[in-house]
């Protein structure tokens, strides 16, 4: 039809017929049943690769500087993909980002004595702060533990200006 009736030449290497769910167009894909525009999984993967560079342990720096870099990436990315308004996907990404930031704080504190002092300063009682600081677990585990979520709740990150992907909905 395209070549005979419309007299157009098609590039067989680039052209294909497939389901809408498999399509990737400008970073978007389409829901199979509803046809809504969704962020393509490859676009999420590219965002996570960018975030991985920001969360690199060897970089050093303050939490505020990291927040600034994150906000530039997240705000631009979310503005571009504003047509996708799924709550669960963006909420999970927000939780993942906050966990990474808590991990960086845990690593920055370095010593159990510092960790205990800082946790106590942020509202944990003495024994719980001591127990959490000396638990012998890694930074990633501690970043999702109850003591770090109590010390650094969502309100802490809002107060320090971290951009929320979910708030854009």
Predicted regions and their residues:
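Non-catalytic terminal/accessory segments
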Residues: 1-169
């Amino acid at each position: 039809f395209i070549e005979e009736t419309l007299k157009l030449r098609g590039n067989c290497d680039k052209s294909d017929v497939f389901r809408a769910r498999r399509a990737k167009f400008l970073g978007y894909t389409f829901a199979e049943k509803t046809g809504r525009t969704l962020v393509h999984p490859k676009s999420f993967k590219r965002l996570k690769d960018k975030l991985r560079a920001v969360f690199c342990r060897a970089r050093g720096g303050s939490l505020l500087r990291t927040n600034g870099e994150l906000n530039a990436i997240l705000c631009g990315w979310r503005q571009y993909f504003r047509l996708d308004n799924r709550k669960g996907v963006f909420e999970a990404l927000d939780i993942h980002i906050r966990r990474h930031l808590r991990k960086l704080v845990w690593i920055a504190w370095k010593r159990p004595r510092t960790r205990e002092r800082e946790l106590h300063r942020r509202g944990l009682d003495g024994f719980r702060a001591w127990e959490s600081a000396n638990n012998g677990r890694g930074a990633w585990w501690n970043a999702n533990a109850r003591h770090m979520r109590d010390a650094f709740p969502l309100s802490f990150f809002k107060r320090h200006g971290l951009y929320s992907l979910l708030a854009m909905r």
